[in-house]
Structure formats: structure tokens, C-alpha cells
Amino acid sequence: MKIKNRIIALIALLCIVIGSLAFIGCKNGGNTKINEIDYVAQLSLNMDSETKKQKVTVYNYIDGDTTHFKLSEPIENTNILKARYLAINTPESTGKIEEYGKAASDFTHKKLQNAKEIYIESNDSNWNKDSTGVRFLVWVWYNTESDSTFRNLNLEILQNGLAVASSIGGTRYASICQNALDQAKQLKLKIYSGTPDPDYFYGEAIECSLRDLRLNIEYFNGKKVAFEANVWRSISGTLYCEDYDEKTDRWYGMQIYNNNNGISSEAKAFLTMGNRVRIVGTVSYWETGATYQVSGLEYDPRPEPGTEKNYIKLIKTGVEPNFLEIDAAEFTGKQNVELELDEDVKKFDYAELALYTSVKATGLKVKKVYTTTNPDSSSVGAMTLTCEKDGKTIIVRTGVWRDDNMNTVTEDDLNDKTIDIQGVVEYYEGNYQIKAELYSDLLRCE
């Protein structure tokens, strides 16, 4: 009898232990439902606090934790504020592409795009900058047509599992931010889910030609690609490359965003004009320019056997830009080029196919000149030339030109003149134009 009682007691004890373990397992990712709290709804914007505040509108969407805002009143002599969101760090969606970077960027974009009003708030009584000395550290608040209550976007991004903490402890909303972050981890949201990001490409680089990339750009968006091309120009961290395709008898181009992060000096040396390079990077949509780019380049001088195809590589040197001379009517035409693609015929704008390639235009009559004078712009002194040839209008955008004597070239030097120019085909505010960045791109002016 005693033995039987002991057995029953042991079984009961075992059940208790197993039940306890099961309960613990549920609390750490099992089936126990966590009481989800909307921390954003608990935080309100105090317009009477000592912090700086200003109503703004969006100037440029950058990524999940960076936005450029147009100010209602200047701050430190600027009307455009480059905002870095306080307390958060979202995955990258420009430059190096990271998991859930696109999701974070899209989340911020959608919230601000649908906002009725947007306010920025400083962390204390001053407008403070981050370590770059360029971006201001702010809290971003917004409301909507359907809800006049302001919501803190920084906190909302954390609450939705789209960011990691960034110096939360030193901020005015530290406690509630930490609570939102802890909850996102408990709920295993987005970057804390442990599941693959559906918008992130995990496979090896897709081998393609530059022609295939350009003609199927939407398909390749978000994917890692590998192709060969001639680097023919480098401007402020952006490379322009081009390649000739015999099948269609055309040149195709691409812009490469290269902020040099993670790229060695050896790689930087061959990512220069005049080199043919194997490019390996991720295709992404560049919100500011409303076009596509390749970014996230990686280089390894001594790659492991079998991994060579995942890195950029120098193919050869001494390659010259093409500078194909364009016809004004052809360049400005719509749906005027037919290409046979996989037994299907598609129509394209000539300029669309020429995007990011090197071109030359001769005999352009300068009809109007606009000079950038906004001190907030990085291109003060650059000009937009409205030109005509054969009854067609071609727009030329210059850099800040200085002649051989280092004198700045102005509109007085160009108005009513006939010019020959060379440059890159770009897309700006719904139109294709020629970007002649260098003074040497002005081939003739008389």
C-alpha cells in the first residue's frame, strides 16, 4: 500500500512539474495570449512643454528613421530640416539593404503621407543635431483626418517591431519607448519575429545583363543582381555605368549608390571612371528621385572558393564613355522605340531606354536659364537650361560650372547662346533631362 501511495505521489509531482514547464513555455512564445497595449495612444503631445516644436510638411522621404521636412520657420538659417528620429534605429533601405528595411521605410512613408498635420519636437529646450552635424534629432508627431489626436511616430515604429533602440535612456519618453520595445519583442513582431522578411531577397545574386535589368526593372526590385558595365562617371557618391547590347543595338545605363560603407580603399580605387566592373548589389526604388538604383555593394579581395560571384570585381581599365549623339525629336518622343522581347514587342520612350547613359546633344539654343539660389540647396549656382532644337524642347541641368580661370559661369554667359553639351540622361520631376555636371561637358558655346 505504501509503495502504491508513493507511486501516486510521484506521478502527481511529475504532473505538476510538467504542467509548470508547459506554463513557462507558453509564457515564452507558446499559446498564452499577451495583453497587447497601444502605448502610442497613452502618449500625448504637450504643446506647453519646454521643448521646441514646429509644424512641418514632408520635403523628402528617405527611410524608416530619416525624413527631410519643410519648415514653417527657419531653424539655423535653413528651411529644410533633415530629421533623424530620436530613440530608434530602423533597418537600412537605402545603401546597404537590410531585412525589414523596406517595411520600416514604407510604414513611415504611409503614416506621413496620410497625415493631416505633422509636428516635430526637440528632446529638450534646444534643437539638437546628431553626430553627423547635419541631421536634427527629433520626435515626430502626426494626426489624421479621422483622428485629431497626435500620435508619436517614433514610438509607433518601435511598437510595431520595426526598429531597435537607439540611446533610449537619454530621451524624454524613455520609459514608454522601452515598454513598447519590450512588447514588440514579446509579440515577436517584424524584426523580432525570427521569420524571413517577405520583401528581402535571401538568394544569391541573379546573373543578368544591364539590358535585362533595365527592361525588367520592376521584377528585379528588391533582388540582388550581378552584371558587368563600364563606369563612366562618379558624382557625389553616385556612379553611372553603361553597357552596349548587340541584340537591340542600344546602350543601357544604371546608377549605383555607393556611400563606400564597408568598401575597402582597393575597391574604391577601381570603382572609378574608365573601368569595366562586375557590379553586385541590390536593386531598390529611390524615393527621392522616383527611379531605381543598385546599392549595397560588397567587396572581398580574398573571397572563399565558390563565393566570388557575390562580390564586385575589376574586369578591365581604359574604357571610354560612349556619348551617343541624340536627335532632339527622337529624344523627346513618346513610345517611339519598339523592341522584341521574348517573342513580344514592347514600346518604350527613347529617353527611358537611354536613362543613365552618356549622351551628347549639339546645336541647342538656350531659351531660358534658371539658377538655383536657395541657400538650403547643395547645388547653389547650378543652372537649368531650357533649350530648343528643331522645334523640340530639351532640358539641361548643369553643375556649378567654373571656367578655366575659376570664374563661375552664369546665365549671362549662356542666355540666347547655341551650345553643344554632353552628360548623363536623368529623370527629374516626371521629365527626362541631360545632366551636364562638369564645365568640360560644355563642348561649345557661341
Q: How would you describe each model-predicted region?
A:
Residues 2-11:
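Bacterial N-terminal signal peptides that target proteins for export
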Residues 22-25:
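C-terminal motif of bacterial Sec signal peptides marking the signal peptidase cleavage site
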Residues 27-29:
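Bacterial signal peptide processing site
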Residues 11-20:
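Bacterial N-terminal signal peptides
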Residues 95-106, 111-114, 147-148, 171-179, ...:
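Soluble non-cytosolic domains of exported or imported proteins
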Residues 32-155:
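Electropositive
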Residues 33-47, 170, 185-446:
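OB-fold nucleic-acid-binding modules
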Residues 92-99, 106, 122-123, 138, ...:
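Second-shell loop/turn segments in exported
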